[in-house]
From Swiss-Prot:
Organism: Arabidopsis thaliana
Gene3D superfamilies according to UniProt: MFS general substrate transporter like domains
Organism placement in taxonomy: Eukaryota, Viridiplantae, Streptophyta, Embryophyta, Tracheophyta
Family that this chain belongs to: Belongs to the major facilitator superfamily. Sugar transporter (TC 2.A.1.1) family.
Membrane topology: Multi-pass membrane protein
Protein name: Sugar transporter ERD6-like 5
Gene Ontology MF term list: sugar transmembrane transporter activity
GO cellular component: membrane
Length: 470
């Protein structure tokens, strides 16, 4: 049994230091921008993999003569690979470091895209898709954690949310390119951001907090100074990280079993709860049914998807800009409320289809609901759960906890993906009313349990959560 963390004893000795200079490093340096760009190249790969299957379905099935079952396996095996990658991601990142883990992930993605490009039979498509999915699963943990660990507290939320923005861009760019080029060339293009990141990893620093965790103190100082700028005073931040890390060395490395000790209860409930509510709030249902809804509204699916992109990217960008100004909680509350309204409108549109006088207006109500949901989800619920996941767990259990939270997210994604058609056959309106109820529950969950992490160091956040008795 691991020892319980005493919040008072973990309070940093550096708290007595004059704090006037602690924010002096909260500036955007060239190294910080470059490092973030390299990291989120992996997020773009993530988005490209998600967006690949939709535009290539027709050409791919015709050229390789795939059955419906074979193409369904090709689409779903990505999630299976991602679940396995997510389960292993935390331990890998703790063992070899955040930077090396991104390189490890990219090797799987490159091999996967290459296998898809060279495929002449279904089995190689599935192998390639599985490999890319595995890389995605690793990325979904390591990228937001790495960005959270390298950025100053005043910039951390916005920079970490760029992960979600690049996923959106990856999906959108791949979907648009897939409308004009063949599936093999699209797979080759998918390798470009992989190569960009692989090259960039040679010039960016490792996470200073991981270096401190493994006792590489000299490299820790060098990495932190590079990220904050050569003229920045890093003494307060450096001392706080060192003090916190040294006190945690008295505790053994956290495992999955250790996560269920009382002192981690609140962090676990918040991290897992946000991911469950995110996935069961209907995001995949909206995504899967969007084209049909657009067609029922008299809008072509291509124009409809472009409309979603037009809403999604600006709203995600707005979330990035507001993250460190308005805070995480207000954005989550607004976002969850908006997704609740969006799902309710879609559900209502299905209900009104049976009212003859209103059936024509119902399709436009569905279109409005989809766009309201998409914009609201992009503002907060899409990215903020990943930001909070990267902030609330202490370094000694971050690998195990992050893996658990990420696996929960992917399992939830698979459950909704698998059951959605069955739910729609059962009751289309009822399906979206259920999603609306989950989104409403998210508002209550955020209001009651989710802490505000804006403007606080990772160490301060973890002190404040403290010991929670179940």
């Amino acid at each position: 049994m691991r020892g319980e963390i005493d919040e008072a004893n973990l309070a940093p000795e550096t708290s007595l230091i004059n704090k006037e200079n602690q924010d002096s490093s909260a500036t955007i340096t060239t190294t910080l921008l470059l490092t973030t760009f390299v990291a989120v190249s992996g997020s773009f790969v993530f988005g490209s993999a998600i967006g690949y299957s939709s535009p290539v379905q027709s050409d791919l099935t015709k050229e390789l003569n795939l059955s419906v079952a074979e193409y369904s396996l090709f689409g779903s095996i990505l999630t299976i690979g991602a679940m396995i990658g997510a389960a292993m991601s935390g331990r890998i990142a703790d063992m070899i470091g955040r930077r090396a883990t991104m390189g490890f992930s990219e090797m799987f993605c490159i091999l996967g895209w290459l296998a898809i490009y060279l495929s002449k039979v279904a089995i190689w498509l599935d192998v390639g898709r599985f490999l890319v999915g595995y890389g995605m699963g690793v990325f979904s943990f390591v990228v937001p954690v790495y960005i959270a660990e390298i950025t100053p507290k005043g910039l951390r939320g916005g920079f970490t949310t760029v992960h979600q923005l690049l996923i959106c861009l990856g999906v959108s760019v791949t979907y648009l390119l897939g409308s004009f080029i063949g599936w093999r060339i699209l797979a080759l293009i998918g390798m470009i951001p992989c190569v960009v990141q692989m090259m960039g990893l040679f010039v960016i620093p490792e996470s200073p907090r991981w270096l401190a965790k493994v006792g590489k103190w000299e490299e820790f100082e060098i990495a932190l100074q590079r990220l904050r700028g050569e003229s920045a005073d890093i003494s307060y931040e450096s001392n706080e990280i060192k003090d916190y890390t040294r006190r945690l060395t008295d505790l053994s490395e956290g495992s999955i079993v250790d996560l269920f000790q009382p002192q981690y209860a609140k962090s676990l409930v918040v991290g897992v709860g946000l991911m469950v509510l995110q996935q069961f709030g209907g995001v995949n249902g909206i995504a899967f049914y969007a084209s049909s809804i657009f067609e029922s509204a008299g809008v072509s699916s291509k124009i409809g998807m472009i409309a979603m992109v037009v809403v999604q990217i600006p709203m995600t960008t707005l979330g990035v800009l507001l993250m460190d100004k308005s805070g995480r909680r207000p954005l989550l509350l607004i976002s969850a409320t908006g997704t609740c309204i969006g799902c309710f409108l879609v559900g209502l549109s299905f209900s009104l289809q049976f009212v003859k006088q209103l059936s024509g207006d119902a399709s436009y109500l569905a279109l409005t609901g989809v766009l309201v949901y998409t914009g609201s989800f992009s503002l907060g619920m899409g990215g903020i759960p990943w930001v909070i996941m990267s902030e609330i767990f202490p370094i000694d259990i971050k690998g195990s906890a992050g893996s658990l939270v990420t696996v929960v997210s992917w399992v939830g994604s698979w459950i909704i993906s698998f059951t959605f058609n069955f739910l729609m056959n059962w009751n289309p309106a009822g399906t979206f009313y259920v999603f609306a109820t989950v989104c409403g529950a998210t508002v209550i969950f955020v209001a009651k349990l989710v802490p505000e992490t804006k403007g606080r160091t990772l160490e301060e956040i973890q002190y404040s959560i403290g010991y929670v008795e179940l």
